[in-house]
């Protein structure tokens, strides 16, 4: 996933890190990226990687809102035999971009269950709990300490969500 903030681009990857060197069809060996990559776009013709935040193995999704980067679905990894492995780290990670956009730092997070996608409105973060078939709402007014507000169940394959402009309706899409 890719998001921008100011003159910087943030790149997350869901590449399997069980084997960091992957042989491509071309016969070339590629080193898979780590964590969240930060690219300086001040001069787009000569964009350059300036930092790699290595606080996660991988991320399914990233979202920028109000100077913070939200890393979602992190540290889930699939082994070569298809078994899911988890490092038990944060399922929601909040990085401060405002203080130093070229070198974000973790300020908060939440561990509980895998989140597949999120949307944010008025300091409320709505997360899709795809495996628990739910939508989870968090108060993120204190980025250092997000608080679980509620969890709505019965939403099969909760894949993506979005809140209406007026904040009165939450839309959810299923992955099936």
Predicted regions and their residues:
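Feature marking well-ordered beta-strand scaffolds used for ligand recognition
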Residues: 1-176
């Amino acid at each position: 996933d890719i998001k921008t903030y100011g003159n910087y681009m943030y790149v997350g990857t869901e590449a399997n890190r069980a084997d960091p060197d992957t042989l491509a069809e071309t016969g070339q060996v590629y080193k898979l990226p780590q964590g969240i990559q930060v690219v300086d776009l001040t001069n787009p013709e000569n964009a350059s990687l300036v930092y790699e935040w290595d606080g996660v193995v991988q991320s399914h999704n990233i979202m920028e809102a109000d100077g913070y980067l939200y890393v979602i679905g992190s540290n889930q990894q699939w082994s070569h035999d298809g078994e899911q492995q988890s490092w038990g780290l944060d399922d929601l990670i909040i990085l401060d971009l405002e203080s130093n956009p070229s070198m974000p730092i973790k300020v908060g997070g939440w561990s509980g269950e895998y989140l597949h996608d999120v949307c944010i409105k008025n300091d409320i973060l709505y997360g899709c709990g795809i495996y628990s078939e739910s939508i989870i709402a968090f108060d993120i007014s204190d980025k250092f300490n997000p608080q679980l507000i509620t969890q709505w169940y019965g939403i099969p394959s909760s894949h993506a969500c979005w809140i209406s402009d007026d904040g009165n309706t939450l839309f959810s899409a299923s992955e099936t």
